[in-house]
């Protein structure tokens, strides 16, 4: 299946790793991304669109994703980085949903979303509630195939550095990878998330499939898949 893929969040930890995995994959001959700044990856296969006005992203996705079969999103932030509840919601929900809806209108068949553990639209916690609402609304778009990752602890390097406190906590949690504590933290490297997402997205949809499918991969399953990779 040589074709194109659209990747969102390509300057973030998971999005960048998905972008790298798609770029390396023989299943895709073109990859397009959009952001307020360009990703660190350069490739003849890559078209990186820089648009600081995120309200235009949906329109751009709908135009650029025509003829593509896949859209993958690692677009996400934190309440602290966004500066407010509204800022967080705008990125994690509004931008993601607008792009998903645009992709559906463009004819995209497979949608891959990096969500979060315990995503639940009925939660009273902003992060969990927002992730859950996005999952619910994306599923309602009825792509032929929707794949949702709910990772636990994500390991890897970020372009935007964490605070000293966050770095300390992550440095401690890294030691849970591969030992008995991994059953609690369910760690996975962002690189492996990118590889798994790309592999699943490149699998052909059965010709006799008549109904939309949704696969949710929880933290424990995702961690196991990551550890099985070289």
UniProtKB/Swiss-Prot annotation:
Compartment annotation: Mitochondrion outer membrane
Transit peptide per record: 1-45
Transmembrane segments: none
Principal location listed in the UniProt entry: mitochondrion
Gene Ontology cellular component list: mitochondrial outer membrane
BP-aspect Gene Ontology terms: import into nucleus
Keywords, sorted A to Z: Membrane, Mitochondrion, Mitochondrion outer membrane, Transit peptide
Record SUPFAM superfamilies: NAD(P)-binding Rossmann-fold domains
Family stated for the protein in its record: Belongs to the FMP52 family.
InterPro entries per record: NAD(P)-bd_dom_sf
Topology term for the membrane: Peripheral membrane protein
Protein's name in the database: Protein FMP52-3, mitochondrial
Species in which this protein is naturally found: Scheffersomyces stipitis (strain ATCC 58785 / CBS 6054 / NBRC 10063 / NRRL Y-11545) (Yeast)
Native organism taxonomy: Eukaryota, Fungi, Dikarya, Ascomycota, Saccharomycotina
């Amino acid at each position: 299946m040589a074709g194109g893929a659209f990747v969102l969040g390509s300057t973030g930890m998971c999005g960048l790793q998905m972008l790298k995995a798609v770029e390396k994959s023989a299943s895709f001959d073109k990859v397009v991304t959009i952001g307020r700044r360009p990703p660190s990856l350069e490739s003849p296969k890559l078209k990186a669109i820089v648009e600081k006005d995120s309200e235009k992203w949906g329109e751009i996705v709908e135009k650029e994703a025509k003829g593509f079969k896949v859209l993958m999103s690692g677009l996400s932030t934190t309440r602290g980085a966004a500066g407010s509840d509204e800022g967080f919601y705008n990125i994690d929900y509004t931008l993601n949903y607008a792009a998903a809806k645009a992709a559906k209108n463009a004819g995209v068949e497979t949608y891959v979303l990096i969500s979060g553990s315990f995503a639940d639209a009925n939660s009273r916690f902003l992060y969990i509630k927002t992730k859950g609402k996005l999952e619910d609304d994306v599923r309602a778009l009825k792509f032929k195939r929707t794949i949702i990752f709910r990772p636990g602890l994500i390991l890897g390097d970020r372009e935007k550095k964490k605070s000293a406190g966050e770095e300390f906590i992550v440095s401690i949690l890294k030691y849970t990878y591969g030992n008995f504590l991994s059953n609690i933290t369910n760690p996975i490297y962002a690189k492996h998330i990118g590889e798994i997402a790309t592999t699943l997205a490149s699998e052909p949809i059965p010709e006799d499939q008549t109904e939309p499918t949704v696969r949710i991969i929880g933290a424990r399953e995702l961690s196991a898949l990551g550890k099985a990779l070289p």
